[in-house]
């Protein structure tokens, strides 16, 4: 049976669920308390991350490399429990590159369901039963008739610490804002009804690329100048203005609402505070949504509003406390094991896995710790830095020049180096493997249609066109542009004996076929016929253009006539037995087969009728 805030069972007799904190943490060391206090449902890897973050003076998550407000516990827990952080935690543990917030946003916007992307990155958990036993800090627990229930802590009003009967007596009034990519939706609920709502979409991110245009511009690669980039940049600015306009129009409602739920990327949050809506950065009413959401629209907002009101049942109070006691003991033992192992191994990295094989183990055997498996992973050996005299800034500029096909700037960039570094720089251009796909500069030039740089690398730098990237493709296969492929083919023609061309995938150039006299004669006749057709087409085009000019002159002449002159011309043609004038009386264009008429006038459209009546009210 599902319960909500509107369930009649909770109108009275609701008591907060209390934990004996002194008994729970009794005998625990300072390090253990840090681990035990991480009341989250993200497993042991999340608790270790929590301990690491508390020991540093920073405002950035070291796993996701994104800003996090460590002064707000709710925001902190919401980040650590999010799919974004859990995904990056697993990827980092497997020595994989972590997602940026923009890339992960692009994955959520893609056509594939987010569940499939979890499967792709291997986001499966073996700790589901263990996680379910933890007491999440983002939920508020209460007791009713000997059973334990919980609601999202975010729905409590400012100043409320625990759930009471008042929580269920009042309407669930709030404002919800969802913004992801170019999709925005907002709504306000008053007296349990949606009173105002607004949703729209703008093109601000390239399909399946992830990230809005402003994030791409600030990524260090320079602002793109394509028509699509300019359109996305314009749409993003208009989108911000529309959102601020909506919030300004709702200002009086927003100042009265007790809760504000906002779900958006971190770099978009300031937009809500900059609007003239009376919302400040540290507004105590602002809440995060404690679950994943889909594409922003009005239906999704309604679904969020319903899910925020759901009440979860956790069984009898005695059973629930017994489960908590068991979990507390397991966490104490694991904390001691982790702390001792860390002191012993020093620089070792630890990955702790939990096994539930001891669920039925006798209590007298608590000292056994075979259910804790501790693996140690040695730090990888430091790799030798290639080309040490070429700093990161120089390499980044080189990469940008190649992408922009600025070969002259690239040459000047190389010439700025000392003579003793030139050979090292040329070796870097020939052999550098650029992450994440281990692409060479030939791959980068071909993929970005940088034809000038491509010729420079082939003919002057002598780059190897058979070197393959991380996907096993040579530079020739990195582009579908026919002009780029022609550069590779021309290079092969000039250097046919240079090496094994089969490895480069560059095809042989087409050989010219010797024609017989008859074939040459037929080819000449076809060219002659084609030329005649082209000449006839040009002649016809000129005639049409001439007729259009004459028609425009006649039309302009007719439009410039006064009403008296038009009527006189019509009478003269009727008396002379000539056909009537088949032109619109207002704009002068030729009339359609069935013109619009009123009085004795003919018009081409209703707009012309309206304009004529407006100009001639009598």
Curated annotation (Swiss-Prot):
A zinc finger (C2H2-type) spans 59-85. The active site is at 213. Residues 510-557 form a coiled coil. The keyword Transcription regulation does not apply. Residues 505-515 have a biased composition (Basic and acidic residues). ANK repeats lie at residues 437-466, 470-496. InterPro entries: ANKZ1/VMS1 (IPR047139), VATC (IPR041540), VLRF1/Vms1 (IPR041175), Znf_C2H2_type (IPR013087). GO terms for cellular component: cytoplasm; dendrite; mitochondrion. Its EC number is 3.1.-.-. Its main location: cytoplasm. Residues 502-539 are annotated as: Disordered. Endonuclease that cleaves polypeptidyl-tRNAs downstream of the ribosome-associated quality control (RQC) pathway to release incompletely synthesized polypeptides for degradation. The RQC pathway disassembles aberrantly stalled translation complexes to recycle or degrade the constituent parts. Dispensable for viability and growth but is required for protection against oxidative stress and for wild-type life span. This is tRNA endonuclease vms-1. It comes from Caenorhabditis elegans.
